[in-house]
Design a protein with these regions (language model features):
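Short strand-turn motif at the edge of the Rossmann-like AdoMet-binding core
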Residues: 27
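C-terminal "post-core" interaction segments
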Residues: 1-21, 30-261
Length: 261
């Protein structure tokens, strides 16, 4: 994806500066492409190697049987659907597959500060979980959603009039230590309410200010508490967006669908 390359370029600038601490703001990131999660984590892991496991995947019975079948193994002899390793290149499909070297800063990083919220979910949590075994990850903000499962898209592609599809939960993912115990979300090391008083990126914004104080060792100046804009930021969303989020959050701990009917 284009944004993977843009992120890679930004990390490349940090690499030139030999940074030791990184702040990653995931508080409004509901997730996305697994490939992007792998690419991003590959930019941050120490001693990057394609032999290192980023995540393991456990599927429901139907998918497990299929991936273990002789037909799958004969058709895809080089595929391992049960684990994903870190990547040294970002592969973008085009008329031909283009490969771009990953800009990795893992060997200079001492720790990562993740700014989190109750909207941090799925692939965002996957990045946190996947990096935890390799370097210190400090969370600042609110507890994350706790979506350690994944789905697959099912629709009737042959029917041109079809406008419906569904995405059943069919897998759970783990980090390299086989840890996946965050169905109630990652609890932050430092709980701080979201700061609606300051713009994102403002060094006085509550969560970022806390991260900076942890990096510099200089206590953040006390400030007047930001006014409460909403009881919940989700209530400010359009109905469809809020409804979509609630579906993700409420179904996050539902396990595998094994029925064939």
């Amino acid at each position: 994806m284009k944004y993977d390359l843009e992120l890679n370029a930004a990390i490349g600038q940090f690499k030139q500066q030999n940074i030791t601490d990184l702040v990653v703001d995931l508080r409004y990131n509901h997730g996305g492409m697994m490939s992007s999660a792998i690419n991003f984590a590959s930019m941050l892991v120490p001693n990057l190697s394609t032999n290192k496991v980023f995540s393991y995947t456990e599927y429901n019975r139907n998918y497990t049987d299929y991936f273990n079948s002789s037909s799958f193994k004969s058709n895809y002899p080089n595929e391992n659907p049960f684990s994903d390793n870190f990547a040294t290149t970002i592969d973008l499909p085009s008329p031909k597959t283009d490969k771009f070297p990953v800009q990795n800063i893992g060997n200079s990083l001492q720790r990562i500060y993740f700014l989190t919220g109750d909207g941090t979910a799925s692939a965002s949590e996957m990045v946190i979980n996947g990096l935890k075994p390799f370097l210190p990850c400090i969370l600042i903000g609110d507890t994350t959603v706790g979506k350690n499962v994944g789905s697959t898209l099912i629709n009737d592609e042959k029917n041109t009039k079809n406008q419906w599809a569904f995405m059943p939960i069919v897998l759970r993912y783990f980090n390299k230590d086989r840890q996946s115990d965050f169905t109630k979300g990652f609890v932050p090391n430092y709980y701080i309410e979201d700061d609606f008083k300051h713009q994102l990126g403002d060094i006085n914004e509550g969560l970022l200010a806390k991260a900076i104080s942890q990096i510099t060792g200089v206590a953040q100046a006390s400030a007047a508490k930001a006014p409460i804009v909403h009881q919940s930021w989700k209530k400010a969303l359009p109905y469809k967006a809020e409804h979509h989020f609630l579906i993700v959050k409420n179904k996050a701990t539902d396990l595998y669908i094994n029925r064939t009917k």
